[in-house]
């Protein structure tokens, strides 16, 4: 089972209804089924991606993403906190959330200002996931970012085309 399962509803919403609708969909779907790890991952990644793009990416404020930044902050923080408590040892959670925490720990409402500690926590999560799933190319590619032997994802690794899948394809291919 892939870490990011194909999500046709999410892909459709991102294209037809926009980022805010996609964020609301993933967040509400996860709240309705909190113990579903895929729903948790999708809620967290959608919030993280929109937050990152609103601050640093090509979308910028001109596309209205600043209006959903508070929602993103809340959704990402809640998903991360819940995930740490309930899925903290699951390699799928560790790999994806570890990456997001490593890059932008200040996206968390419980971020205490210690960037290095939280970034290292994210790195440790990725490496722990890699130990558990040594043969998973996605997790290996995330872990290899910290070594001289970079691993690239094959172009056809992801089945879907959601924003986060496109992001990871661009970053890891």
Regions found by a protein language model. Name each.
Residues 20-24, 46-82, 102-132, 146-162:
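Short coil/linker segments at helix-helix boundaries
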Residues 157-173:
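Terminal, non-catalytic domain-edge segments
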Residues 1-11, 32-62, 88-108, 135-152, ...:
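Amphipathic alpha-helical repeat scaffolds of TPR domains
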């Amino acid at each position: 089972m892939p870490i990011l399962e194909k999500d046709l509803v999410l892909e459709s919403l991102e294209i037809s209804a926009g980022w805010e609708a996609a964020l609301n969909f993933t967040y509400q779907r996860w709240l309705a089924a909190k113990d579903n790890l895929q729903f948790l991952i999708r809620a967290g990644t959608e919030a993280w991606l929109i937050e990152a793009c609103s601050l640093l990416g090509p979308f910028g404020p001109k596309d209205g993403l600043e209006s959903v930044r508070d929602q993103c902050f809340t959704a990402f923080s809640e998903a991360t906190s819940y995930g740490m408590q309930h899925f903290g040892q699951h390699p799928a959670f560790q790999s994806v959330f570890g990456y997001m925490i490593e890059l932008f720990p200040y996206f968390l409402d419980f971020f205490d200002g210690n960037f290095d500690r939280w970034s290292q926590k994210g790195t440790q999560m990725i490496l722990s996931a890699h130990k558990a799933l040594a043969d998973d190319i996605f997790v290996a590619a995330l872990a290899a970012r910290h070594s001289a032997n970079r691993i690239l994802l094959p172009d056809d690794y992801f089945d879907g085309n959601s924003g986060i899948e496109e992001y990871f394809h661009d970053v890891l291919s």
